[in-house]
Amino acid sequence: MLLAELAEVSRAVAATPARLEKIARLADALGRLAPDERAVGASWLAGDLPGGRVGIGAATLRAALEAAPPERSGPGLTVAEVDAALRRIAAVAGPGSGAARRRELDALLARAGNPERRFLAALVLGELRQGALEGVLADAVAKAAGLPAAEVRRAAMLAGALPPVAEAALSEGAAGLARFRLRVGEPVSPMLAQTAADVDEALRALGGEAALEWKLDGARIQAHRDGEAVRVFSRSLRDVTAAVPEVVALLRAAPEPRLVLDGEAIALRADGTPEPFQVTMRRFGRKLDVERLAPELPLTAFFFDALVAGGAELLARPERERWAALARAIPAERRVPRLVTRDPAEARAFLEDALARGQEGVVAKALDAPYEAGRRGAAWLKVKRAHTLDLVVLAAEWGSGRRRGWLSNLHLGARDPASGGFVMLGKTFKGMTDAMLAWQTDRLKALATGPLDAWQVPVRPELVVEVAFDGIQSSPRYPGGLALRFARVKRYREDKRPEDADTIETVRGLYGG
């Protein structure tokens, strides 16, 4: 398939808010991919690069696009050719790697038309937002392959990713999907929680009685044991076994020889309170001297679910049964603190105790719900005390899908008194109602300092917005080295001027907290 065809599908999918039309267009494209293009094509349509980032930043990409020659006629780029080029770029390393990546990128863009360039730019930066979430794409794979959507979703859950499932479904049908099952030693995508405003809302949503567990501000881990073989995986399914010898020892000491457990690893202070998230994450760096760092910064594992225990796979079993299996496998001090209640007052006290002890909050869980790997299920509801900052809007991006036609993805910055400017801390389109999107689009158009037909529109830094977020993390992507975690807009502060916004020093203070 030509890249231009895939770029047009992406544009058309972004242009329609209708789920069924998105599915139909995606299914048609998936069905036309050559066998060796199916996995990568599915990845791209999901907005992902199969191998992750390719080492090209926004500044390099912008310069390459500006230097690209005018469009010219000739043979179009194929999906396979572009995939090979991106893999070559990602593989470049060593002295002069930046210049070598730029040469490869220039050669690729020289053969691409403008729609293809826009598609590639969004793909490389991880910003291809076309309203084709994984659920929509899974339904499209099912439609293209003539298979039940539930079977495709379950296979993707167990595979930890949709692209290999798409390739198997399109190439082999039901027989291909049958290969995907939970195997000890191979990670599955973790179940995630939706958000509730408070524990009262969480209990109501879950039908009264629920289990409440501390939400630790640590690193999510999935620990597998098969005899003496132990493997530990991160939330992103990266093998981190070598980084966590404490977890390996705990699993080997368990009374059961076959286990798959879900939990958190966290660095604790001497008084038992948690270190900041970024301190825990020092143990998970890619260049890590574990023998030196582990004694200085030990990790403690706490588990809250069992996917395999007692000789059985437990994904489909109710939460209360999975907890009972976990309790038989792991001692109480290595399980998260837990309360089963239907009493809102008791639940509020449990939350306040967790917060007082430095934890993020609690997760409320439906006692009869299965483990929905890879899904942000309504059976788990997290309740946290959010932080807020007043930040300034520096730019905005045009939305896609339901947000098409609105400036929606806000670039947010903190005031820098030293320079008189602003330091970007991240982007978000979360938390905005349709009315807010319409209002801010009109205001941002009036403040634009660049062309309105560009994908990203810079604006005069005059609008102050109150932003809620869950934490602050280090990030080489932004000039200040910091980024907000899970930022969402609460409201615009029209009563505040840019000089009233929070400063980067305030943000650094929260980070060092």
Curated annotation (Swiss-Prot):
One of its GO terms (biological process) is DNA replication. ATP binds at E213, R220, R235, E264, F304, R376, K382. The active site is at K215 (n6-amp-lysine intermediate). InterPro entries: ATP-dep_DNA_ligase (IPR050191), DNA_ligae_ATP-dep_bac/arc (IPR022865), DNA_ligase_ATP-dep (IPR000977), DNA_ligase_ATP-dep_C (IPR012309), DNA_ligase_ATP-dep_cent (IPR012310), DNA_ligase_ATP-dep_CS (IPR016059), DNA_ligase_ATP-dep_N (IPR012308), DNA_ligase_N_sf (IPR036599). The keyword Lyase does not apply. One of its GO terms (molecular function) is metal ion binding. Keywords: ATP-binding, Cell cycle, Cell division, DNA damage, DNA recombination, DNA repair, DNA replication, Ligase, Magnesium, Metal-binding, Nucleotide-binding. Its cofactor is Mg(2+). Its EC number is 6.5.1.1. It catalyses: ATP + (deoxyribonucleotide)n-3'-hydroxyl + 5'-phospho-(deoxyribonucleotide)m = (deoxyribonucleotide)n+m + AMP + diphosphate. Belongs to the ATP-dependent DNA ligase family. DNA ligase that seals nicks in double-stranded DNA during DNA replication, DNA recombination and DNA repair. HAMAP family: DNA_ligase. This is Probable DNA ligase. It comes from Anaeromyxobacter dehalogenans (strain 2CP-C). The gene is lig.
